[in-house]
Regions:
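N-terminal Rossmann-like FAD-binding beta1-loop-alpha1 element of flavoenzymes
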Residues: 6-33
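Glycine-rich FAD pyrophosphate-binding loop
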Residues: 25-49
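Dinucleotide-binding Rossmann-like beta1-alpha1 core, especially the glycine-rich loop
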Residues: 52-132
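Rossmann-like flavin
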Residues: 96-193
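A glycine-rich dinucleotide-binding beta-alpha-beta segment and adjacent secondary-structure elements
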Residues: 175-183, 398-464
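Helical element adjacent to the flavin cofactor pocket in flavoenzyme catalytic cores
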Residues: 199-250, 255-256
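Mid-domain catalytic core of redox enzymes
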Residues: 241-359
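C-terminal segments that line or cap access tunnels to active or ligand-binding sites in enzymes
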Residues: 308-416
Length: 490
């Protein structure tokens, strides 16, 4: 990079940074995007090996239709990235004998109302009796009647406390708890009811399970390609070392590849690494620093990448859960103390079942995972990986016979790739800040930092929703904020 003076610098080409940079360039700002890795995508990065194309761990998004994913592509003049697979997903729940049984769903069509027959089949699969069904109907009816104002009043109530009003059947509660774990990667008795209900409405109206042609990370690679065509400058393998601040005003970024000047910096590195390391505590008041240090991350995913000698699963992704395997606060605390659960919730994604081009003919890659603490140095990882192997074979007999090779991954891998550890036991989180009570809605950290010209983008500020969709939502919102700031101060 020969030039070093820009209108704005975006740190990180993840699901928040890459779309935000593209939108800024489209708006006419001379923008630099720096990324410490050799490609875009962040936690949703897509890689290639031995003919397989896959993410480093399971990634799907939502909503599937009318999404911010498709909106960013349209804004950049790009074609839809939505895959056209057939068998969408399967959920597995144990019967009375402890044998996991499947409930399979085909790829949903857009603008299709809920199917009452399918809903009843799901209740039968869960073993819900008539009394339980009445409680579920009352819960669903009253929740559907909530206005946006009503939902906003639930920022300080956990989803567990909200649903506990209805005396729901245990299997149905377990399914809701599983959804809290998979969509938000936090315990059901911590997730804010407002966030859960608002995002669930988006999913109900437009389905879940978004995946991009060419791999999930391909969506963000395309954003960067468009960014470059719009005149943006990209620096891969460029690690931000310091955000330069003088007299309360951003001046630029110091990196391993030189120093770049700009009056605006947008950080996709996470609010805690940005404040505590890239900027430095000395530039903020003590109350703000304490608030940032107190922010709680989501839980993490750890697991195994299995490379199979033949296709084993037909569905594009699946989730196996039970009354004993979803993660609540009590179970999470036991795991943080080093206990390996007897029963694990399992989340698998099969990229080539979304897009057949992502695996060699006659083979399959299975990205398997379970929830765990976010500590990059969590203990007993080998025991967790062995437990995952055992759960995979127990739930899906014959699976292990198809495994040609495998690779394990854990919280240290996540932290090293995407989020530097700046506080004890934090850094390996799956999403970023947890969407828990005290950190959602009116309590969400502001995207504009208390330093002139500094903004946060991604899952930590500026958006709402499910994982990567929250990050892209943030990209739109923060790009608008930055454009306005530039107009006022440029």
């Amino acid at each position: 990079m020969t030039q070093n003076q820009f209108d704005a610098i975006v740190i990180g080409a993840g699901p928040g940074g890459a779309p935000c940079a593209a939108l800024l360039a489209k708006g006419g700002l001379k923008t630099l995007l720096i990324e410490q890795n050799n490609r875009a995508g962040g936690k949703a990065m897509t890689v290639n090996k031995d003919g397989f194309t896959y993410e480093l761990w399971p990634v799907t998004g939502g909503p599937m239709y009318n999404s911010r994913f498709e909106e960013i592509l349209a804004q950049l003049g790009l074609s839809s990235g939505l895959t056209e697979h057939t068998i969408h997903n399967a959920m597995y729940y144990p019967d009375k004998n402890g044998v996991y049984q499947a409930y399979v769903s085909n790829r949903p069509e857009p603008n299709t109302p809920p199917n009452p027959e399918a809903m009843m089949a799901q209740m039968k699969w869960l073993g819900i009796d008539e009394e339980g069904l009445e409680a579920i109907i009352r819960f669903a009816t009253e929740t559907a009647a909530l206005t946006p104002y009503d939902i906003d009043q639930l920022d300080d109530i956990t989803y567990h406390d909200y649903v506990s009003r209805y005396n729901l059947p245990t299997p149905f509660y377990s399914m809701l708890a599983m959804q809290s774990n998979i969509v938000y990667v936090v315990p059901i008795d911590q997730v804010a009811a407002s966030e859960f209900i608002k995002t669930s409405r988006d999913m109900m109206a437009n389905s879940a399970g978004y995946y991009s042609k060419g791999g999930y990370g391909r969506l963000f690679e395309r954003c960067v390609e468009a960014f470059e065509k719009l005149g943006g400058t990209v620096g891969y393998r460029t690690r931000a070392e310091k955000i330069i601040v003088e007299n309360g005003q951003v001046r630029g970024v110091q990196s391993n590849n030189g120093t770049f000047s700009a009056p605006i910096v947008v950080s996709n590195a996470g609010i805690q690494p940005t404040v505590l390391k890239l900027v430095g505590e000395e530039h903020f008041d003590r109350g703000y620093v304490n608030r940032v240090k107190d922010l709680v991350p989501s839980l993490a995913l750890m697991g195994t990448r299995y490379y199979l000698n033949k296709p084993f699963f037909k569905e594009a992704f699946n989730i196996a859960f039970s009354d004993d395997s979803y993660v609540n606060t009590e179970r999470s605390m036991r795991a943080k103390k080093g206990e390996v659960p007897e029963e694990l919730l399992i989340f698998n994604v099969m990229p080539s079942n979304f897009d057949p081009e992502l695996a060699p003919s006659g083979k399959q890659c299975v990205l398997s995972s379970t929830l765990c603490p976010a500590d990059p140095d969590m203990p007993r990882t080998e025991d967790w990986w062995r437990k995952i192997d055992g759960m995979m074979e127990r739930i899906w007999p014959g699976f292990s016979e198809c495994v040609e090779s495998k690779e394990t991954y854990g919280t240290r891998h996540v932290s090293d790739l995407t989020r530097e550890q700046v506080l004890p036991k934090i850094g390996g989180e799956c999403i970023g800040l947890g969407q828990v009570v005290g950190q959602c809605g009116k309590h969400k950290p502001a995207a504009a930092a208390p330093i002139r010209g500094l903004f946060y983008v991604g899952c930590d500020a500026g958006g709402y929703g499910c994982g990567t969709h929250q990050a892209v939502d943030s990209a739109f919102n923060v790009a608008d904020m930055v454009a306005f700031y530039h107009k006022m101060h440029g």
